[in-house]
A protein has these predicted regions:
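Flexible "arm" and connector segments at domain edges
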Residues: 1-65, 71-116, 121-231, 235-273
Length: 273
């Protein structure tokens, strides 16, 4: 891997960004006015712009959008510092200590809080600590959830770590994945297809009731409610199938969106002559 910048240059660039942010916070009316609440919508927008660049694999845009997201992280830290709550060093140190704690196969817990954390020798054979030995990515993921449960301020339940504000499709995937990490999953992944077909059949029956058998407005409202619930079950089961076959459903749907847009634009252009 070619090194574009030295460690010193990277640290200097980060410090340069903090210096500029400090100046903007003091001298720019717009930057000075911002709060956590006012920045939040912009943060969401910048995150989606980064996701868009990642999906399109546009390197220049990825670099640009990463900078925008990084600015927001530093901005929130600056606001926290002004309130004497925390600063960017606290953010970084908390992250590093969490990573060390959650990677016992890479770091000994004695390295938590160390200025220069030192990883364990590769393939340490005499380390009998819990979670210290892993042989696969799946084992790392399984250990991850169990380790999080042991944290002092960790999640009290398996699913409490899933943010309420996640988009529903992503949220469903995370719920299922977290449940899998504690053993709640299909014994055979092919068994999920029976569930998918069952949910589609139930949805079809409710839709037929809605459009063919419901005569009163009250009956139509009830049928629509049930059909909506059944469609949710269909979506949840399809997301489960995608997960079991190691397909990210959000990425898959976005690829289809882009494919449709490309084809539609082509048809539209031809129609215009």
């Amino acid at each position: 891997m070619e090194q574009r910048h030295t460690r010193e240059e990277k640290m200097a660039a980060f410090g340069r960004m903090l210096d500029v942010l400090d100046a903007l916070r003091e001298k720019c009316p717009w930057d000075r006015k911002q709060t956590n609440e006012s920045l939040r919508p912009n943060t969401i927008e910048e995150t989606y712009e980064l996701c868009d660049a990642l999906m399109k694999d546009e390197v220049a845009d990825i670099c640009k959008e990463l900078g925008d997201v990084l600015l927001h992280i530093a901005f929130y830290a600056r606001i926290g510092e002004e309130k004497s709550q925390f600063d960017i060093a606290d953010v970084c140190n908390h992250l590093v200590d969490k990573l060390i704690f959650r990677h016992p196969h890479v770091y000994h817990p004695s390295q938590i809080g160390a200025p220069n954390p030192r990883p364990l020798p590769y393939g340490e054979e005499n380390d009998e600590r819990e979670f210290a030995k892993v042989k696969s990515v799946e084992q790392v993921l399984d250990n991850w959830e169990q380790i999080k449960q042991k944290e002092k301020d960790g999640n009290k339940t398996v699913l409490s770590g899933v943010p309420d504000a996640l988009p529903s499709l992503v949220k469903a995937y995370r719920i299922q994945d977290k449940a899998r990490n504690v053993g709640f999953d299909w014994e055979e992944r092919r068994d999920v297809w029976k569930k998918v077909k069952e949910e589609i059949t139930e949805f079809e029956a409710k839709v037929e009731t809605l459009y063919n058998n419901a005569e009163t407005e009250e009956a139509k409202a009830a049928a629509k409610k049930h059909a909506t619930e059944e469609f949710g079950d269909v979506m949840f089961s399809l997301i489960n199938a995608a997960r079991l076959y190691k397909i990210n459903p959000d990425n898959a749907l976005e690829h289809t969106n882009q494919k449709f847009i490309k084809r539609f634009n082509y048809v539209e252009a031809k129609a215009r002559g």
